[in-house]
A protein has these predicted regions:
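Conserved catalytic motifs of ABC-family nucleotide-binding domains
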Residues: 76
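Catalytic Walker B motif of ABC-type/P-loop ATPase nucleotide-binding domains
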Residues: 80-83
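Conserved ABC ATPase signature
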Residues: 55-59
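Helix N-cap at the start of a conserved alpha-helix in ABC-type nucleotide-binding domains
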Residues: 91-93
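H-loop/switch region of ABC-family ATPase nucleotide-binding domains
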Residues: 116-117
């Protein structure tokens, strides 16, 4: 299981992009040759080729988030958990990151679990949804089914993507 927390800066431990990715690989016992290959592959996967020797402070916030994603992906987890991964990004950066995660999901076949307050960015990608309230699961299941069950509950309706609130509102009216 690979995890990327919302406070991505707190997960960074190295000076350069390459060292950041290498750190967890070396701790997992990979050989230096395997580490080098995985560092290059991971940087390529997240759209940061040739940034291996960049200092972390030379990277933008969005690039550092993608670097952290690369360091998680380099271990090739079966499950990737992202906790508010776009919290510090502008809308274009958020859409770009989720499109990247979708490409990686399809290329590597890993399960992706996203904890997110703004589901609008996830709409093109999500297949299942879990809505929680005060720490308890209120609705879960395939996305459309869960959205339809959540809509009548006012406290959950606000959490649905805007397009689905409009769609379900029109269906209820007509």
């Amino acid at each position: 299981v690979g995890i990327m927390l919302d406070d991505y800066e707190s997960q960074m431990v190295s000076l350069t992009a390459g060292e950041e990715i290498s750190f967890s690989l070396l701790n997992h016992g990979f050989s230096p040759d395997e580490v080098d290959a995985r560092v290059k592959e991971a940087l390529n996967d997240v759209g940061l080729p040739d940034r291996e020797n960049y200092q972390l402070d030379e990277l933008s916030g969005g690039q550092r988030q993608r670097l952290l994603l690369a360091s998680v992906l380099a271990t090739r987890p079966d499950i990737l958990i992202l906790d508010e991964p776009v919290s510090a990004m502008d809308p274009d950066g958020a859409r770009s990151l989720y499109a990247l995660v979708d490409r990686i999901h399809k290329a590597h076949g890993m399960t992706v679990v996203v904890v997110e307050h703004d589901l609008n960015y996830l709409l093109p990608y999500m297949t299942h949804m879990v809505l929680m309230e005060t720490g308890k699961i209120k609705v879960q299941g395939p996305f459309e089914e869960a959205a339809r069950r959540a809509f009548p509950q006012e406290s959950l309706r606000a959490n649905l993507p805007e397009l689905w609130r409009i769609k379900l509102g029109l269906e209820a009216k007509y």
